[in-house]
Curated annotation (Swiss-Prot):
The 3Fe-4S cluster is redox-responsive, probably binds 1 cluster per monomer. Residues 414-431 have a biased composition (Low complexity). It is found in: Plastid, Chloroplast stroma. This is Chloroplast sensor kinase, chloroplastic. It comes from Phaeodactylum tricornutum (strain CCAP 1055/1). Its main location: plastid. The keyword ATP-binding does not apply. It is an enzyme of class 2 (transferase). Residues 1-50 form a transit peptide. The gene is CSK.
Length: 583
């Protein structure tokens, strides 16, 4: 196995297929990270760099593009298999507006503290704003570099070894800082005995040694929001250590303290804005879900009104009673009021869309998964986690089946004995739901998503009767053959009745929507004999005892390339277009 050689400014470079570890260093050579996860600002070391492109969170064997760049502008590109050290926490970055404000403030601070013996030259060499993060391994407070001044270039340092074990290679002796993020005590000498006031403020400006090559102490300023430490500003000098006394004057400390106060206020405001954005997102999701669930019974009401008109007219012709016109008028009023209610709900869609508009962030970290246990957000994250997938929908890591709602460990595989080509199964002790295709199989379930729902012992026939009755009326109006097979003496199950009703409504509604589409390869038009069938089947006894709900239809089924999108939030229109184009 070959290696990668990077020797300062020399022209000796050799690139091969290697297993490497990536290190990020600041402009002074201080160590910042031992992982390739996250999109970090660029850092340079001795004029030699490696630019990593499109890095989000790199796992073992993840392929990415490396560009090695030296001062002579010679470029080499190669696809290599990358193996990083255990994932470090992705930096929680503030908003773009705060970043621009902070850089302007730091530039102003640098220009306001000149060297006494060199007019026009700033006494400040570099500045960095660190954000707090808890170490998931030790539980101790660490600080992650978020904003740097001068604004770093895209240059990076790349150090590689041949070890496949993931053990970090030996660092060059010129590097003075050990791997890892900055521990709290290295930036705050008095930690944990630091405290703020009742509002945004700064702590005592102290000198800390963070670069042995310079010898001069840097200034450390803790930033507070009330009693909580929200960041640390580190200011490094551009001059060497004086023989006597400090490199910083009293005026310098006061100026740094004032800049820190401005950053503390801005950071507190940015944190509050992000928290409000998260609340806004939750409210938008809740409103969108509620609006969707309101439309389903509203549609059933309108269908009942139409059927009522037909029945009244038929009965009126048979009985010749004089009440028929009055009853028809009442049914007509029912339809009119249903239409009015539907019109009143249309502006709510606009409100939901406006609430869903987001302010762009510097970094949008991926949602935490089982393989990213080390990702930890702040108590009030500056960047909210994104998850476009509905909370009740997850994909099984073992079988690839889509699983919703319920937390039982396994799902019993069920075949389709009816006329349907697609089957959706709600299975387990009233607490599993999965989507099956013709090659259905069992898979492990994710952890429980029902922690905040009230579970109770119920009988499915009692819970589902209102739902099935509404769809019987809709099926009659649309010309769909709708049947319900119910096995006698089904056991009681522990469920959240309302949640199960809404889940079943969504699944049956989808079946009604797509059952008329022609089957693949069909030369005919819409499905002439649309059929939807509901079956309740008792599971085998044991740990999986319960009831399985099968929703079957004889429509075209779901194309394989779109099956992993059926529960994605906001994907319904795109999925509908794909289905209709596919057939």
């Amino acid at each position: 196995m070959s290696s990668i050689y990077l020797h300062g400014l020399s022209r000796r470079r050799r690139i091969g297929s290697v297993i490497v570890a990536i290190y990020m260093l600041d402009s002074c050579g201080a160590f910042l990270s031992a992982s390739g996860s996250g999109r970090y600002p660029g850092f340079s070391y001795r004029g030699l760099s490696v630019v990593t492109e499109n890095i989000r969170s790199i796992h073992s064997s993840r392929r990415l593009k490396l560009t090695v760049n030296a001062t002579n502008k010679e470029m080499y590109e190669r696809q290599d298999s990358i193996h990083t050290l255990p994932l470090s926490p992705i930096p929680v970055m503030p908003s773009q507006l705060f970043q621009e404000l902070a850089l302007s403030q730091l530039e102003l601070l640098a220009n306001s503290i000149p060297c006494a013996d060199r007019p026009g030259v700033s006494k400040i060499k570099t500045m960095a704003l660190y954000l707090p993060q808890e170490n998931v391994n030790t539980g101790q407070l660490e600080f992650l570099p978020a904003i740097h001044y001068p604004h770093p270039s895209r240059e990076r340092v790349f150090i590689a070894n041949e070890a496949a074990s993931g053990v970090a290679p030996a660092l060059p002796r010129t590097l003075t800082t050990l791997p890892g993020f900055a521990h709290a005590t290295s930036l705050l000498p008095g930690y944990p005995m630091v405290s703020g006031g009742s509002e945004a403020s700064v702590g005592v400006v102290e000198e800390v040694i963070c670069d042995l090559t310079s010898g001069a102490a840097a200034l450390s300023v803790p930033l507070f929001s009330g009693s909580r430490t929200v960041g640390v500003l580190l200011v490094s000098p551009s001059i060497s250590k004086r023989r006597k006394g400090s490199a910083w004057t009293k005026e310098d400390r006061e100026q740094v303290g004032r800049a820190g106060k401005s950053l503390s206020l801005a950071l507190s405001m940015d944190t509050e804005r992000a928290a409000l954005q998260m609340q806004n997102d939750r409210a938008a999701r809740a409103l969108s879900d509620s609006l969707h669930q309101i439309k389903n019974p509203l549609q059933a009401m309108r269908t009942y009104g139409k059927l009522l008109q037909r029945r009244i007219a038929d009965l009126g012709l048979l009985s010749n009673e004089g009440m028929t016109p009055q009853l028809l008028e009442m049914a007509e009023h029912l339809l009119v009021q249903s239409d009015r209610l539907a019109d009143r709900l249309k502006p709510v869609d606009t409100i939901v869309d406006s609430l869903s508009e987001r302010t762009p962030f510097v970094l949008n970290p991926a949602a935490p998964t089982k393989t990213q246990d080390s990702l930890v957000s702040l108590a009030t994250p500056l960047v909210p986690w994104e998850s476009e997938t509905l909370e009740f929908a997850r994909e099984s890591k073992t079988s690839g089946e889509l699983v919703i709602f319920m937390p039982t460990k396994k799902v019993a595989a069920s075949g389709s004995n009816g006329p349907s080509n697609s089957t959706t199964s709600f299975s387990g002790n009233g607490s599993d739901v999965s989507t099956y295709t013709e090659d259905d199989g069992a898979g492990e379930m994710p952890s429980s998503l029902f922690s905040e729902m009230d579970l109770e012992m119920s009988f499915l026939s009692d819970v589902l009767d209102p739902v099935l009755a509404a769809f019987r009326a809709i099926a009659e109006d649309r010309g769909i053959m709708f049947s319900h097979d119910d096995t006698e003496d089904l056991p009681g199950v522990t469920i959240c009745p309302q949640a199960l009703q809404e889940a079943l409504i969504n699944v049956i509604d989808n079946a009604f929507t797509y059952v008329f589409l022609p089957k693949p390869g069909s030369r005919f038009g819409p499905n002439p004999s649309a059929e939807v069938r509901i079956r309740l089947v008792q599971n085998s006894k044991g740990s999986d005892a319960g009831v399985t709900i099968l929703v079957e239809d004889n429509g075209p089924g779901i194309p394989a390339e779109t099956r992993d999108q059926i529960f994605d939030r906001g994907k319904d229109q795109a999925l509908d277009w794909t289905l209709r184009k596919h057939w």
